Design a protein with these regions (language model features):
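Polybasic, proline/glycine-rich intrinsically disordered low-complexity segments
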Residues: 83-140
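Canonical SH2 domain fold
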Residues: 63-81
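Negatively charged, low-complexity tracts enriched in Asp/Glu with abundant Ser/Thr
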Residues: 2-62
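Short, flexible loop/turn elements at secondary-structure junctions
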Residues: 60, 67-69, 91-93
């Protein structure tokens, strides 16, 4: 790939972001990533349009995932070599409504599936989120 076609790596200063609140929960995410997937995650993502709901970046071996509109940190993933990654998830009810670890594991895995695609399609991810919301509301 030509150098000029490579996206700049996302970093903390690229977008509005808040720290993980004191009110959070921790769980272990068992998942392996190949080198290409880790490279995509390390590159991060800077939102480009309103429907692009996530800003994420990696510092060291930690991924920080923030909602693009509010800057709230929803997930923090500390990557581990044994594929037992430590995840902190926001539990501040004013910032994030989910309170169920099982639901967070499903949601985070879906996000990671999208974020490790090349190229990442924020629009497809947005549609999937809308569909999940309708299912939860019993509207589908």
């Amino acid at each position: 790939m030509k150098e000029e076609n490579k996206k700049a790596k996302a970093c903390r200063k690229d977008w509005k972001n808040e720290p993980m609140p004191e009110k959070h929960e921790t769980f272990v995410l068992q998942r392996s990533f190949n080198e290409k997937q880790m490279d995509l995650l390390r590159a991060g993502h800077i939102p480009e349009v309103m429907e692009d709901k996530w800003f994420f970046y990696v510092e060291g071996e930690t991924l920080f995932a923030h909602r693009s509109w509010t800057g709230y940190c929803i997930y923090r993933i500390d990557f581990k070599e044994d594929d037992h990654h430590i995840v902190r998830v926001n539990r501040d009810p004013e910032q994030y409504g989910c309170t169920d670890i099982k639901e967070d594991i499903v949601n985070l895995n879906k996000l990671l599936d999208y974020w490790t695609r090349d190229p990442y399609d924020h629009y497809e991810e947005w549609l999937d989120e809308i569909q999940d919301g309708l299912k939860k509301a019993g509207k589908e």
